[in-house]
């Protein structure tokens, strides 16, 4: 069944003022998909369902440069990354020479790579750290950015990853760089740029270094930046971010890629299990719940695979550990959302939403064609039994989480959004190309 969700008018009633009360830290959002890795907020979170430029905007802060990385949040601080072009422009710009390159932005200026810390209450910049300065070797796809990988934090240190331009450990209080790592220069497929975000568990930081040359997974000591282990792999570029889950009393690092999906032992890098079935362009990241993991791709072939991790060993392709799979309406850029046993995912990067029982793979309702949402690069998030989906054109649809989801609101902001939303307590944070927005109600403090 396909039906159309029609936009309706959200009338602005009042102009919101800056919030001078306390933004409660009901939860942190320490990585690009939150503390669960699934894009979900705790049940205590209850952000607004309606907003506009004149309604429920507590503050918005102008951002320098460009970045599609998601903000991460710890208590009263928000952290984000940005790439800032500067200096004289090269004329003509330097084109990408990657095989098969298309729709890429040629590089015309040097860039500074910044980390910015913003006060969650006021939106004021607390500190800004310049991590690196260089003339990028790739411009990347025209829809991307030079700062697309999201940082991750444990509250004491922030780990900001700029791919070929370095990994930086930064003191959250002062902005001081503690250590840095240079992994070399990536050669991404078609020169489309970099974007896999790091994952953190305990003292171990995981980096996906898949590209067109020698690919590898790095496990680093978060205190020193030194290798704990390195697993070399025969993989092409994948933009998928690692997911760390606990299964059979073992922490597994799960990474989706073209040749194989693999689960690595977090302690030593040993491959626990592997499975084929992904495409040549893997962008979406996995989600997991109750010992199951869900992985999707959509270009150049469509696939969505559900895997039971319990007892999985060796090559599990075509075994009973593959619970179900589909090649219909699978995700490309936005990752799936896994919320209370339901899998929400968008077709390619378009406004066609599938709602599926995660365990069985059976359609729960829909699919739904959302006419108002055209290009969607950000991944859906969920809070308080509602789903939030934001398009690049600045429109967010809020949908109820129930057996038959209903549209609750269509909210428009005058900015372009590729970064995924972050949720902290009763507040939603949207990072646009020009501004960072704090969305909340004055009554909820």
What residue ranges belong to the model's regions?
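Cleavable N-terminal signal peptides
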Residues: 11-13, 19, 23
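Noncatalytic, solvent-exposed loop/strand surfaces
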Residues: 21-445
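Bacterial N-terminal signal peptides that target proteins for export
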Residues: 1-9, 16
């Amino acid at each position: 069944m396909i039906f159309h969700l029609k936009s309706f008018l959200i009338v602005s009633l009042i102009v919101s003022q800056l919030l001078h009360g306390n933004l409660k830290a009901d939860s942190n959002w320490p990585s690009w998909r939150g503390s669960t890795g699934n894009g979900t907020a705790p049940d205590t979170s209850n952000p607004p369902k309606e907003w506009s430029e004149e309604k429920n905007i507590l503050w918005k802060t102008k951002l320098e440069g460009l970045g599609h990385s998601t903000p991460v949040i710890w208590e009263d601080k928000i952290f984000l990354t940005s790439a800032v072009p500067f200096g004289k422009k090269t004329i003509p710009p330097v084109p990408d020479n990657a095989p098969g390159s298309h729709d890429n932005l040629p590089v015309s200026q040097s860039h500074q790579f910044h980390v910015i810390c913003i006060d969650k209450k006021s939106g004021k910049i607390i500190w800004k750290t310049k991590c690196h300065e260089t003339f990028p070797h790739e411009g990347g796809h025209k829809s991307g950015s030079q700062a697309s990988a999201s940082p991750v934090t444990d509250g004491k240190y922030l780990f900001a990853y700029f791919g070929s331009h370095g990994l930086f450990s930064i003191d959250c209080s002062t902005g001081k760089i503690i250590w840095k790592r240079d992994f070399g220069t990536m050669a991404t497929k078609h020169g489309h740029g970099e974007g896999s975000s790091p994952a953190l568990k305990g003292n171990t930081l995981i980096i996906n270094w898949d590209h067109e040359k020698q690919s590898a997974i790095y496990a680093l000591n978060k205190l020193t930046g030194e290798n704990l282990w390195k697993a070399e792999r025969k993989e092409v570029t994948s933009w998928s971010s690692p997911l760390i889950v606990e299964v059979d009393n073992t922490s597994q690092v799960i990474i989706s890629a073209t040749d194989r999906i693999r689960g690595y032992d977090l302690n030593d890098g040993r491959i626990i299990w592997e499975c084929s079935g992904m495409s040549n362009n893997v962008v979406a990241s996995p989600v997991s719940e109750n010992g199951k993991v869900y992985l999707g791709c959509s270009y150049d072939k469509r696939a969505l695979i559900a895997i039971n991790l319990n007892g999985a060993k060796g090559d599990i392709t075509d075994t009973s550990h593959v619970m179900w799979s589909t090649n219909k309406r699978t995700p490309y850029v936005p990752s799936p959302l896994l919320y209370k046993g339901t899998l929400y995912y968008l077709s390619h990067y378009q406004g066609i939403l599938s709602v599926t029982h995660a365990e069985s793979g059976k359609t729960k309702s829909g699919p739904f064609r959302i006419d108002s949402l055209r290009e969607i690069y950000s991944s859906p998030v969920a809070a308080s039994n509602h789903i939030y989906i934001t398009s690049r054109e600045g429109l967010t649809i809020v949908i109820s989480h129930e057996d038959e989801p209903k549209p609750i609101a269509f909210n428009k902001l005058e900015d372009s959004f590729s970064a995924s939303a972050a949720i902290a307590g009763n507040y939603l944070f949207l990072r646009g190309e020009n501004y960072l927005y704090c969305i909340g109600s004055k009554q909820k403090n």
